[in-house]
């Protein structure tokens, strides 16, 4: 969707992110990927207030966990509703299998502090088709 003031697309964004980092034993990565991509992501994104999710795998670095997921939320409320609690309590063979290989996990809930809403964007050189001012 284009914004009237410029030609850049506008995407709904929440003001809270849930950051989840995990370390997984190499022999369990296939089971972990299957669980996260095929079950965990779709289930969580059904919960009202979850906006989006992006997953990353460490390319280089030390002292950090290999897998990262950034969940974008409207606010912290989705983590407190019954649907979220029911998903966490529901048995899942694929999740149980994947969890056997998770050796470390860290999680943090972050609230946006700047700008207060929306996103700060630098368009000065990111869009090469536009003339630079």
PLM feature spans:
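Macromolecular interaction modules
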Residues: 2-133
């Amino acid at each position: 969707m284009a914004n009237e003031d410029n030609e850049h697309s506008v995407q709904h964004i929440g003001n809270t992110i849930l950051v989840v980092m995990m370390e997984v034993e190499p022999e369990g990565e296939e089971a972990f990927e299957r669980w996260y991509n095929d079950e965990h992501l779709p289930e969580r994104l059904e919960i009202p207030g979850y906006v989006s999710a992006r997953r990353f795998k460490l390319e280089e670095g030390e002292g950090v966990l290999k897998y990262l997921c950034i969940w974008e939320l409207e606010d912290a409320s989705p983590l407190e509703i019954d649907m979220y609690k029911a998903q966490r309590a529901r048995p899942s063979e694929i999740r149980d299998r994947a969890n056997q290989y998770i050796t470390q996990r860290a999680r943090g809930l972050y609230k946006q502090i700047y700008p207060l809403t929306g996103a700060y964007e630098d368009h000065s050189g990111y869009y090469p088709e536009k003339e630079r001012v």
